[in-house]
Amino acid sequence: MTEPLKPRIDFDGPLEVDQSPKFKAQQTFDENQAQNFAPATLDEAPEEEGQVEAVMDAALRPKRSLWRKMVMGGLALFGASVVGQGVQWTMNAWQTQDWVALGGCAAGALIIGAGVGSVVTEWRRLWRLRQRAHERDEARDLLHSHGAGKGRAFCEKLAQQAGIDQSHPALQRWYASIHETQNDREVVTLYAHLVQPVLDAQARREISRSAAESTLMIAVSPLALVDMAFIAWRNLRLINRIATLYGIELGYYSRLRLFRLVLLNIAFAGASELVREVGMDWMSQDLAARLSTRAAQGIGAGLLTARLGIKAMELCRPLPWLDDDKPRLGDFRRQLIGQLKETLQKAPTRREN
């Protein structure tokens, strides 16, 4: 059956019409008002790692102080005096035919020569580490250049320094992707997207493994002194592996330049307190309730180890970061928390068995 039609309904008031926003009248500013006009600036929120990155940069940046110049000048003068005195002793021993003294002078000359050779080798390694910063500047210039002819030679030099063989699949894909009509910016960009991620992936794995080992070891270690020694040893090994991965051989002085960052990494007590305070936001209620003090310290040590690895990766990397390819601390944080969660969940299971 069909329903009967409803009666008509008459409304007293008019229908409401949607009022579209109207544009304001045009305003013209005179010269006085234009001088007093200033655009509003939004306060950008500080980055999560900005303050700590500034501290790391300050720790790595060598300070050219007057005392350092005086010490270097004194050492140079002392070395020149030792060499001059040795030459004089050698001449006197030769004239007087004092063969014992002449043999001692020869032994001293060999020792001094070995010391000079070591200093030259260390200086060369330190120069190589500083040269990597110049290579990043050169790569940054090429990424903003519209010229041609320099990008391919530069990328081939980087591949040779990193020990990438010519038959490597990533390098072969890069050779197949470039052609003569491309400029330097396009050639370097292709290298950054095809070849450089091979080394970056290996560096990320090294950082993730070292951070996980630091987290788990600190969480189960009962001695604070052992914790500090373990962190220092693991971080030094991490620096060496990352530098070797990017084709840089670290010497004593170049390693000392990064050792200050390791000292910052040892002092992880403050970060551990922060991890305990914000643990409720990172994990579930159950896991945060079971998170012990040692486990929180382990997470803090792992996060700072990951930060150290990211900074060492940035210093040893020949190319600047492009787009979003820079590793984030949050990625390693999620991995550490996941591994710690699995460890805490496996512990009660083993006890029950």
Curated annotation (Swiss-Prot):
Please provide the record's keywords in A-Z order.
Cell inner membrane, Cell membrane, Membrane, Transmembrane, Transmembrane helix
Q: Which Pfam families match?
A: DUF697
Q: Which family does it belong to?
A: Belongs to the UPF0283 family.
Which gene is this protein's source? ycjF
Q: Which InterPro entries match?
A: DUF697 (IPR021147), UPF0283 (IPR006507)
Question: Which cellular component terms (GO) are annotated to the entry?
Answer: plasma membrane
Cell location: Cell inner membrane
Give the chief site where it resides. membrane
Regions that span the bilayer? 70-90, 100-120, 213-233
**What is the name of the protein in this document?**
UPF0283 membrane protein YcjF
Q: Is Phosphoprotein set as a keyword in this record?
A: no
- Give the way it sits in the membrane: Multi-pass membrane protein
Keyword Membrane listed: yes
